[in-house]
């Protein structure tokens, strides 16, 4: 709802981590303009990414969070509106998501072919090297590699050569940042 959007923005910029205050700091004002519309007024300046940044705002349900202390850490799975819900977890180790059978968006054309698994389990590894070795040993099924050195050298293993592991570049066609070292060479 419009109330959820405004409440989320105001809560993140007042009670959220400093990251959110900085991230949304170029918004001067947010207000309702219609039954289902919200307007964000920007501060003067040259932040061309701000519309994209606001489009990434995760909307929180006001009715759920306003009766809880938003600033406190909790292990209670939050209320969501997506295709999966948290059904089991061990903090710092694993989390299991179960598909919501009556999810409101399941029949939308944009979701065709998505969210096909009944359960998804994420295992967490504190060390990237151990995670890579666990993947090679078949402990988990999917790995996104973002280190160019590992992409070039770490997957020269029998399971890649015989096709049990498929190493594939996947174009996602989304706007994203870059991975680089950028040096400030200005003298002033």
Specify the residue positions occupied by each region the protein language model found.
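Stable alpha-helical elements in mature extracytoplasmic
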Residues: 1-9, 49, 80, 100, ...
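Aromatic- and charge-enriched surface segment that lines or borders ligand/interaction sites
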Residues: 1-18, 33, 39-41, 125, ...
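Sec-exported extracytoplasmic/periplasmic mature domains
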Residues: 10-17, 45-47, 65, 102, ...
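Extracellular/periplasmic solute-recognition and catalytic clefts
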Residues: 12, 29-31, 87-98, 123-187
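Short, solvent-exposed secondary-structure boundary motifs
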Residues: 15-24, 72-79, 159-164
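Surface-exposed binding/hinge segments that line
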Residues: 20-64, 83-90, 186
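Envelope-exposed proteins and targeting segments
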Residues: 26, 34-38, 80-82, 93, ...
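Gly/Pro-rich hinge or "lid" segments in bacterial periplasmic/extracellular proteins
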Residues: 54-121, 126-130
């Amino acid at each position: 709802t419009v109330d959820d959007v405004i409440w989320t923005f105001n809560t993140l910029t007042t009670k959220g981590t400093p990251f959110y205050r900085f991230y949304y700091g170029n918004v001067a004002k947010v207000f309702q303009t219609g039954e289902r519309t919200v307007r964000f007024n920007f501060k003067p300046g040259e932040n061309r990414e701000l519309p994209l940044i606001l489009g990434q705002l995760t909307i929180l349900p006001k009715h759920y969070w306003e009766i809880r202390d938003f600033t406190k850490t909790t292990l209670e799975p939050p209320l969501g509106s997506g295709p999966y819900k948290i059904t089991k977890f061990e903090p710092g180790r694993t989390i299991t998501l179960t598909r919501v059978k009556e999810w409101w968006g399941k029949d939308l054309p944009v979701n065709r072919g998505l969210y096909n698994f009944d359960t998804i389990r994420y295992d967490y590894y504190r060390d990237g090297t151990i995670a890579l070795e666990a993947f090679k040993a078949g402990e988990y099924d999917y790995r996104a590699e973002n280190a160019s050195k590992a992409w070039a050298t770490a997957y020269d293993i029998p399971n890649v050569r015989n096709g049990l592991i498929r190493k594939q570049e996947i174009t996602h066609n989304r706007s994203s940042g870059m991975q680089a070292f950028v040096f400030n060479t200005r003298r002033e």
